[in-house]
């Protein structure tokens, strides 16, 4: 069994990226490390979505991966979707470099993210903290905007 997975992201013109997942055993946190180019400067919602389906672009990826039927939240919240990874930040050059350690994301076991999609969004994820008119959507999606790139998370070759 491989302890690595990879997603190659494609989407809007010029938006590309590679994201690596590593996890030695199911009880360990998953390390998610990558680079995404071609983004507008600032924060971008970043999520694992339910389906590894790209037949209609990133729309086919479905909703956030949520096997425990929770509301949307931030990556450090107790109540959140498994797929809620928060935001990645692109610098003035449009490149986001990041490393995330997450205790809910798994590349082994019953609730693996392998075979699902990784999606980067146009806008900032509000981490389920939206108020007023935005509260209902905040608890589902984080009001993160359109999907600008996605890729299927696949088992990676051993190093």
Swiss-Prot record:
Catalyses which reaction? Answer: 2 superoxide + 2 H(+) = H2O2 + O2
Give yes or no: UniProt keyword Chloroplast.
Answer: no
Localization annotation: Cytoplasm
SUPFAM superfamilies given in the database record: Cu,Zn superoxide dismutase-like
Please name the InterPro entries in this protein's record: SOD-like_Cu/Zn_dom_sf (IPR036423), SOD_Cu/Zn_/chaperone (IPR024134), SOD_Cu/Zn_BS (IPR018152), SOD_Cu_Zn_dom (IPR001424)
Q: Where are the transmembrane segments?
A: none
Q: This protein is called what? A: Superoxide dismutase [Cu-Zn]
Provenance organism: Haemonchus contortus
